[in-house]
Amino acid sequence: MSKKWFTYENGTVKEYGSVDKFPENCVGFVYKITNIQTGKFYIGKKSLYSNIRKKLTKKELAEYSGPGRKPTKKLVTSESNWMDYWGSNKGILQEIKDSSTDSFRKEILKFCFNKKQLTYWEVHYQCINEVLLTDKSYNDNVLAKFFRKDLVESE
C-alpha cells in the first residue's frame, strides 16, 4: 500500500523514498494527499521518528551503576511509518481501501525542523486552504479545537 512522497517546486518534482533524502535535521513534514479523480484533499503533519519507552533487559539492569534508583525503562528512537502513512482521517482511509492508492497523490508541502514548526505549518496550510469551509477537504477539524460542524451557520 506504499506510495512515494513528492515535492513540487519551480516546475521540478523530487521523490522521497527514504529518510536519507530529507534535509539534514528534519523532524517531519506537512503533507497534502489529493484524490486525483475528485480533487478532494487532506492536509496533515507527520513525524519522521517516534520515541518508544522500552523496558530494560535484566542484563542492562545488572550493568547499571550509578547513584539513586535504577531506571526501569529506556527511550528508543526509531523511524516512524511515514512511508506507508495515508493520514488519520477515516473518510480518506476508507476511500483508499475501497479504490486504490493509484487514485491519490502524496505531496510534501513543508519540511520542519522541530515539533512546534510542524504544528504551526500544519495549521497554516489548513487555514490558507480553508479546509473547514470547503467541501473539497477531508479535514474535519483543525488542532482538534475547531470543527467543521461548529462553523456551519444555522438558519
Per-region residue spans from a language model:
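Structure-specific nucleic-acid interaction/processing domains
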Residues: 2-155
